[in-house]
Amino acid sequence: MKLTCVMTVAVLFLTAWTFVTADDSRNGLKNLFPKARHEMKNPEASKLNKRDGCSNAGAFCGIHPGLCCSEICIVWCT
């Protein structure tokens, strides 16, 4: 009997704790990914399209295609 009461109180406490600490979900999925949605409407706004530190055509790259903006490297960026 004591064990049943302890288990019941523990379950009620954990349930209440879950509701108290849960995030506010009134907005639902409305603002879940606002930045991604903006970038889908305007692909130029995506930071993934920007390549900082890449070399333009004609620059020496050795054998590392990641150094070229075009991702094509045969000793020089093409």
Curated annotation (Swiss-Prot):
<dbReference type="GO" id="GO:0019871">
    <property type="term" value="F:sodium channel inhibitor activity"/>
</dbReference>
<dbReference type="InterPro" id="IPR004214">
    <property type="entry name" value="Conotoxin"/>
</dbReference>
<feature type="disulfide bond">
    <location>
        <begin position="68"/>
        <end position="77"/>
    </location>
</feature>
<keyword id="KW-0732">Signal</keyword>
<feature type="propeptide">
    <location>
        <begin position="23"/>
        <end position="49"/>
    </location>
</feature>
<dbReference type="InterPro" id="IPR012322">
    <property type="entry name" value="Conotoxin_d-typ_CS"/>
</dbReference>
<keyword id="KW-0738">Voltage-gated sodium channel impairing toxin</keyword>
<keyword id="KW-1015">Disulfide bond</keyword>
<dbReference type="GO" id="GO:0090729">
    <property type="term" value="F:toxin activity"/>
</dbReference>
<keyword id="KW-0379">Hydroxylation</keyword>
<keyword id="KW-0964">Secreted</keyword>
<feature type="disulfide bond">
    <location>
        <begin position="61"/>
        <end position="73"/>
    </location>
</feature>
<keyword id="KW-0528">Neurotoxin</keyword>
<keyword id="KW-0165">Cleavage on pair of basic residues</keyword>
<protein>
    <recommendedName>
        <fullName>Delta-conotoxin-like AVIA</fullName>
    </recommendedName>
</protein>
<feature type="signal peptide">
    <location>
        <begin position="1"/>
        <end position="22"/>
    </location>
</feature>
<keyword id="KW-0638">Presynaptic neurotoxin</keyword>
<comment type="function">
    <text>Delta-conotoxins bind to site 6 of voltage-gated sodium channels (Nav) and inhibit the inactivation process.</text>
</comment>
<dbReference type="GO" id="GO:0005576">
    <property type="term" value="C:extracellular region"/>
</dbReference>
<keyword id="KW-0800">Toxin</keyword>
<comment type="similarity">
    <text>Belongs to the conotoxin O1 superfamily.</text>
</comment>
<feature type="modified residue" description="4-hydroxyproline">
    <location>
        <position position="65"/>
    </location>
</feature>
<keyword id="KW-0872">Ion channel impairing toxin</keyword>
<keyword id="KW-0960">Knottin</keyword>
<dbReference type="Pfam" id="PF02950">
    <property type="entry name" value="Conotoxin"/>
</dbReference>
<dbReference type="GO" id="GO:0044231">
    <property type="term" value="C:host cell presynaptic membrane"/>
</dbReference>
<feature type="disulfide bond">
    <location>
        <begin position="54"/>
        <end position="69"/>
    </location>
</feature>
